[in-house]
């Protein structure tokens, strides 16, 4: 590692380019301990290693005695301790709670430290001050944010098939607007997107899905009325066609509202998930249909990394967000950084995002890993003669900070820090 570059990257004020952080009272309502910090992602590795669903649920339940949970947790922890998910927790334990090694002697005193630090201001202490984060792009689907420098990314799709009527009733109540047909729902969508702007939203979030055929407004209006009347529209894939139509309309609204479309691509949290349905190349028809919209494609498209790099290189309306990928597979992240640095324009990349809901401490760990990985990868580019030191330093500044202001331009209107 080039020490000078490493020190620069570690000290740099940076953007946390993807979180789901809830308002702090959600974290403060829990009595956290050392095992609970593994609940969001590392618990998936425990399950993958063979822990039963029942034991995993018990191990992550703070209401169960810590001693019992440790007995369940410890054997499987030995199998997962070197995965990226566990490394993020271990980094947080070391830097924030003074625990160099989690074992029979340290789990109880470390848990006491974690509980004692679970106080108001925890997000700013761990991410803002200790983590040197100056801006958070936060997809908690709420207007309420945990810190003043966190800005909401909200829902692109207002309706989906599984909860159609419940969601519609919620929107009608929230906005005091009665929906009777497709035209009136499209009018409601416009009202909602204006509300997004009033509440400092900087982007809208969707998930990559297999492309559906295109239908016209007349056909969509017929489907809408049938669904509204709790009837199934005729045709095997009609629901997918209808919701694809609505998604296209939402993307058009996002473009007109200057909201970036953030897209989950690739790997899914959990176990036994079919993540092929969210493959990054499924996005290509949408990217072509909406050249005026901005798409920030998440998670390096893992495991389809080369495809993600190719899409970012080939499409003028795409940026590539490496959030979470540095936790899923740290080594793959570093290999990708080296490839991206020499293939994708430097203004199209966001380097990291913690991607947690109630775990600003674990996000700190994931972001610290990302900085170290970025430093190693760019040091390799210097060593190989592909980048000079000054070029690598400039690249890290763009990826970690300044690119966020062009990829999410609404941030410029609200951010309490200067570009």
Task: Please describe what each predicted stretch is.
Residues 92-260, 269:
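Active-site gating/metal-coordination segments in enzymes
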Residues 18, 136, 204, 254, ...:
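Conserved, mostly hydrophobic/aromatic
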Residues 13-26, 261-266:
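Histidine-centered catalytic micro-motifs
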Residues 282, 292-419:
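H/E-rich (His + Asp/Glu) clusters that bind or coordinate divalent metals
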């Amino acid at each position: 590692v080039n020490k000078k570059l490493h020190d620069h990257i570690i000290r740099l004020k940076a953007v946390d380019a993807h979180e789901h952080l809830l308002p702090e009272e959600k974290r403060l309502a829990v009595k956290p301990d050392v095992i609970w910090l593994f609940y969001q992602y590392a618990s998936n590795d425990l399950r993958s290693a063979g822990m039963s669903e029942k034991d995993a649920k018990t191990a992550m339940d703070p209401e169960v005695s810590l001693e019992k949970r440790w007995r369940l947790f410890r054997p499987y922890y030995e199998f997962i301790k070197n995965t990226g998910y566990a490394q993020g927790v271990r980094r947080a334990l070391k830097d924030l709670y003074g625990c160099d090694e989690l074992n029979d002697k340290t789990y109880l005193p470390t848990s006491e430290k974690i509980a004692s630090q679970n106080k108001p201001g925890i997000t700013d202490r761990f991410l803002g001050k200790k983590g040197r984060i100056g801006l958070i792009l936060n997809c908690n689907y709420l207007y309420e944010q945990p810190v003043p420098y966190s800005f909401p990314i909200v829902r692109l799709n207002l309706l989906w098939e599984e909860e159609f009527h419940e969601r519609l009733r919620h929107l009608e109540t929230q906005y005091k607007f009665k929906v009777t047909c497709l035209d009136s729902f499209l009018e409601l969508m416009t009202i909602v997107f204006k509300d997004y702007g009033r509440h400092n939203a900087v982007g809208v979030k969707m998930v990559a899905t297999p492309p559906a055929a295109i239908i016209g407004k007349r056909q969509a209006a017929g489907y809408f009325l049938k669904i509204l009347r709790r009837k199934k529209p005729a045709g095997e894939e009609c629901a997918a066609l209808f919701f694809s139509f609505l998604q296209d309309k939402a993307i058009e609204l996002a473009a007109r509202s200057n909201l970036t479309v953030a897209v989950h691509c690739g790997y899914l949290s959990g176990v036994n998930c079919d993540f092929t349905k969210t493959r990054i190349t499924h996005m290509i028809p949408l990217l072509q249909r909406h050249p005026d919209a901005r798409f920030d494609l998440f998670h390096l498209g893992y495991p389809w990394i080369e495809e993600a790099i190719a899409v970012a290189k080939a499409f003028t309306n795409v940026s590539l967000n490496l959030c979470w990928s540095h936790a899923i597979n740290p080594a793959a992240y570093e290999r990708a950084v080296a490839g991206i640095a020499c293939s994708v324009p430097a203004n199209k990349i966001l380097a990291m995002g913690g991607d947690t809901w109630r775990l600003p401490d674990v996000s700190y760990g994931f972001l610290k890993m990302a900085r170290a990985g970025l430093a190693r990868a760019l040091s390799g580019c210097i060593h190989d003669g592909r980048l000079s030191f000054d070029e690598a330093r400039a690249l890290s500044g763009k990826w970690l900070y300044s690119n966020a202001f062009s990829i999410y331009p609404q941030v410029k209107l609200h951010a309490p820090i200067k570009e």
